[in-house]
Amino acid sequence: MITTGRVWKFWDNVSTDEITPGRYNLTKDPQELARIAFIEVRPEFAEKVRRGDVVVGGKNFGIGSSRESAALALKAAGVSGIIAKSFGRIFYRNAVNLGIPLLIGDTDELEDGDVITVNWETGEVRKNGQTLQFEPLPGFLLEIVREGGILEFIRRRGDLCIG
């Protein structure tokens, strides 16, 4: 799972309401959700994000309400994964359950607009010849992401057993 894309850098404490604001959050259609992603804080995001781009956050990315639509909107927008200093715990599981790879670590070296290559399995990020190391998902969660999310994992394997 290696991707190359542009960085969309965000700040600490990005809430699920900033990702998919409640007043727009009236649908479960992924493409509609992609169109409202970050609409109030980065209105250009939905139009300019490209498949493979990477969302980068600070501390507590995805805090707030448990709306799955926040992670679903980013997946539908084509984001290849999310790197942050830390994640809101419910957002973290929603992202994994939807098959979105996550990395944790110091994101200070990554800037908005950087083009990076990410190995989501090892946590290695390359930027302008520089290699940065992040913490990848632990084994079982990485297996879920590799399968495309929890539903696909269960469909292919028949249960949630490891091995």
Swiss-Prot record:
Transmembrane segments: none annotated. It catalyses: (2R,3S)-3-isopropylmalate = (2S)-2-isopropylmalate. This is 3-isopropylmalate dehydratase small subunit 2. InterPro entries: Aconitase/3IPM_dehydase_swvl, AconitaseA/IPMdHydase_ssu_swvl, IPMI_Swivel, LeuD, LeuD_type2/HacB/DmdB. It comes from the Archaea. Belongs to the LeuD family. LeuD type 2 subfamily. Keywords: Amino-acid biosynthesis, Branched-chain amino acid biosynthesis, Leucine biosynthesis, Lyase. Heterodimer of LeuC and LeuD.
